[in-house]
């Protein structure tokens, strides 16, 4: 099952708001498997997602797709 990349990075708590996640995608700060991602691009388990925010780059691998925001311990189970 796939999830929109903006919803996924918000759900796993890499951004504080869904609109901030969409803005990061539109600004070219999110890459999926090396390619710049638009907010609606789907992610599936096994994809590599790079998010550049506040001068830091987070590189995570999708292990589980979710679209609802969950607690931090549950969110940590969705990526490596």
Which stretches of residues belong to each language-model region?
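Glycine-rich, charged/polar anion/phosphate-binding loops
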Residues: 48
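A basic, amphipathic helix-loop patch mediating RNA/tRNA/ribosome contacts
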Residues: 1-45
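Short, solvent-exposed secondary-structure boundary/capping segments
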Residues: 68-78
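Short, charged beta-turn/beta-strand-edge "cap" motif at the junction between a beta-strand
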Residues: 54-58
């Amino acid at each position: 099952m796939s999830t929109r990349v903006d919803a996924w990075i918000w759900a796993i708590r890499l951004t504080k708001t869904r609109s901030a996640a969409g803005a990061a995608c539109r600004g070219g700060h999110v890459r999926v498997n090396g390619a710049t991602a638009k907010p609606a691009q789907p992610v599936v388990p096994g994809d590599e997602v790079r998010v550049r925010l506040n001068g830091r780059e987070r590189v995570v691998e999708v292990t589980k797709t979710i679209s609802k925001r969950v607690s931090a311990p549950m969110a940590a189970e969705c990526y490596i």
